[in-house]
UniProtKB/Swiss-Prot annotation:
SMART domains: Ribosomal_S10
Superkingdom of the source species: Bacteria
Lineage: Bacteria, Pseudomonadati, Pseudomonadota, Betaproteobacteria, Neisseriales
This protein's name: Small ribosomal subunit protein uS10
One Pfam family of this chain: Ribosomal_S10
Amino acid sequence: MSSQKIRIRLKAFDYNLIDRSAQEIVETAKRTGAVVKGPVPLPTKIERFNVLRSPHVNKTSRDQLEIRTHLRLMDIVDPTDKTVDALMKLDLPAGVDVEIKLQ
């Protein structure tokens, strides 16, 4: 599997969770002898919502809510078979979305 690259993109609402997951991936890849670039923090996506507080009147009274989506990007250069096996066995928390691409 030499001269390949694995690109891993992590997405989560909690930045502590995503940083711990990224650290686990980096440690696992380095332990198996691969070169890791990253994690690179990508811009945080912020979605804002305005919701009426009252079901009937008082249109001027509203709640403002937001959801922040944190992103991290990392590349694993020249992965070995051990690296791929270790990453497949890695157990990450449920709040982290992982996208893996082979390039």
